[in-house]
């Protein structure tokens, strides 16, 4: 199967070179820890907007979680096929849209904390751009990703490979995309993924055997930079990523 080769050539219809730190932890990051990082950065952007000074950089995290489940703000526990008091992995109700999803190693999670005032203050546009990022990545792998009318996410051959759910406060985003690269899918059998009964879930490695997250990450960076007009600056400083210093 085709493999990642070089940079994507895509046309951005958003900002013009907005600065953004890129954090790519090499270790598995517990969900609550990553959620805390996003909220701290969101607060930083909000305070920067209120101060009237130079705007702080935006931020993007690309990482993997240990097994867990997350429920969106209004998600129904009817879509859990287990007792929520005794989940098979940690269960979190969080401040994003959407229903229940599963996270696990081998799934690349993309968390952009962006100020949509620098791009476009339109959540429908933002969700479609996140879908397009995934579609661009799949195209670089020689795969044809598809949308389904009325739903959010990206599918391959009717199998959902990317779930999308976001939170937004005063146009500052958090949460984002969960892209199944080479994760085990058994955890999805304990829920109705995204509340969509009867729809299959897949991994990119089903179409590209041997594919690893490390091969997909640079493609995601290229697509994010192109679609959102970001100047991504890799930053390995854990203190900055975790909000302990700026």
From Swiss-Prot:
GO terms for biological process: protein modification process. It is found in: Cytoplasm. Keywords: Acyltransferase, Cytoplasm, Transferase. The active site is at 194 (acyl-thioester intermediate). One of its GO terms (cellular component) is cytoplasm. The keyword Transferase applies. InterPro entries: aa-tRNA-synth_II/BPL/LPL (IPR045864), BPL_LPL_catalytic (IPR004143), Octanoyltransferase (IPR000544), Octanoyltransferase_CS (IPR020605). Its EC number is 2.3.1.181. It catalyses: octanoyl-[ACP] + L-lysyl-[protein] = N(6)-octanoyl-L-lysyl-[protein] + holo-[ACP] + H(+). Signal peptide: none annotated. Coiled coil: none annotated. It comes from the Bacteria. Substrate binds at residues 96-103, 163-165, 176-178. Pathway: Protein modification; protein lipoylation via endogenous pathway; protein N(6)-(lipoyl)lysine from octanoyl-[acyl-carrier-protein]: step 1/2. Its main location: cytoplasm. Residues 54-240 form the BPL/LPL catalytic domain. The record marks 160 as: Lowers pKa of active site Cys. In the reaction, the free carboxyl group of octanoic acid is attached via an amide linkage to the epsilon-amino group of a specific lysine residue of lipoyl domains of lipoate-dependent enzymes. HAMAP family: LipB. Belongs to the LipB family. Catalyzes the transfer of endogenously produced octanoic acid from octanoyl-acyl-carrier-protein onto the lipoyl domains of lipoate-dependent enzymes. Lipoyl-ACP can also act as a substrate although octanoyl-ACP is likely to be the physiological substrate. NCBIfam families: lipB. This is Octanoyltransferase. It comes from Synechococcus sp. (strain WH7803). The gene is lipB.
């Amino acid at each position: 199967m085709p493999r990642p080769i070089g940079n994507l050539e895509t046309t951005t219809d958003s900002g013009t070179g907005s600065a953004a730190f890129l954090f790519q932890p090499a270790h598995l990051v517990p969900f609550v820890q990553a959620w805390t990082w996003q909220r701290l950065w969101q607060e930083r952007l909000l305070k920067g907007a209120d101060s009237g000074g130079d705007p702080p950089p935006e931020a993007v995290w690309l990482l993997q979680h240990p097994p867990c489940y997350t429920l969106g703000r209004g998600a129904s526990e009817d879509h859990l096929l287990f007792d929520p008091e005794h989940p098979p992995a940690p269960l979190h109700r969080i401040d994003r849209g959407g229903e229940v999803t599963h996270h696990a190693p081998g799934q690349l999670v993309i968390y952009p904390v962006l100020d949509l005032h620098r791009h476009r203050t339109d959540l429908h546009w933002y969700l479609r751009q996140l879908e397009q990022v995934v579609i661009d990545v799949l195209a670089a792998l020689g795969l044809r990703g598809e949308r389904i009318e009325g739903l959010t996410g990206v599918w391959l051959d009717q199998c959902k490979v990317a779930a999308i759910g976001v939170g937004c406060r005063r146009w500052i985003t958090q949460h984002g995309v969960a892209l199944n690269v080479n994760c085990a899918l058994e955890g999805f059998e304990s829920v109705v993924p995204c509340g969509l009964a009867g729809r299959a879930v897949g991994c990119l490695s089903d179409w590209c055997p041997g594919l690893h997250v490390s091969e997909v990450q640079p493609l995601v960076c290229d697509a994010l930079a192109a679609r959102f007009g970001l100047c991504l600056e890799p930053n390995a400083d854990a203190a900055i990523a975790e909000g302990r210093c700026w």
